Each structure stands twice: as C-alpha cells, then as structure tokens.
Amino acid sequence: KEAVRLIRKSAVQGNAGAQFNLGTRYITGHGVIQDYTRAFTMFQAAAEQGLALAQFNLGLHYFKGRGVDRDDTQSYMWLEVSRLNGYANAVETINIVANKLTGSDVAKAKDLARECFDKKFKGC
C-alpha cells in the first residue's frame, strides 16, 4: 500500500515513469482496484511526456477498447508514434492493426502520428 501511495504521489506530480507504473497496476489490479479507464488516463499522461512504452500501451487500449472506445485509427496512430519514438517492438502490432484499416485510414493514421511526433506528443 505504501508503494502505491508513493507511486500515485509521483504520478500526480507528473513523473512519466510513475504514471506508466500506476497505469500498469490499474491493468493488473496489483495494489489497486483494476480500472482500465484509469490505466488509459495514466498511459495518456505518460505518453504526452514522450514515454514510448506508454504510447504503445495507448495504442493497445484503443485497439482493444479498454478504458476508451475502440478506435483502430487512433490505435495505429499511437502505435506508430511509439515506433517513431524508438519503440521498435511496435512494428508487429502496427501490422496487425493495419489489417483492420483501409489504405486511406492507414495513410490518415500515419499523418496523425507524424503530426503528433512533430508536436512533441502534445494535443494528440
């Protein structure tokens, strides 16, 4: 309980690593009540600070509809952002999501990802 309290405090103060850690705990229910919506919120906060693994997890949440409405275009966009930001393991998942989209939707998602990357992940 003390560990979760300290992680939560650090997350509220804007620490991206703590936000990611807390998001992961909300998925697993480790030390907190499982809550995909809160997990999504924590991953979003960390993703906007440039944490590639959080960006990848946002993409997964959009793909699975966990804590957010399912949206394959947003999923692809965040997965691509994580790849552009150095998370090479995103490629396999990007290909899976791409199979759910039309060619024009993939192009749109790639454009959104590039815009997001260029804006330093703010307001994506």
What are these regions (language model features)?
Residues A88-C124:
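Terminal, low-structured helical/coil segments at or just beyond the last alpha-helical repeat
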Residues V12-N15, T28-H30, D35, E48-L51, ...:
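Short helix-capping/linker turns of helical repeat alpha-solenoids
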Residues S10, R25, A46, H61, ...:
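TPR/TPR-like alpha-solenoid repeats
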Residues G23, Q55, G59, R70-L79:
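Predominantly extracellular beta-rich ligand-binding scaffolds that present long acidic/polar faces
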Residues A3-A11:
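N-terminal segments that cap or nucleate solenoid repeat domains
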Residues L6, Q19-T28, V32, M42, ...:
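Hydrophobic face of amphipathic alpha-helices that form TPR/SEL1-like repeat modules
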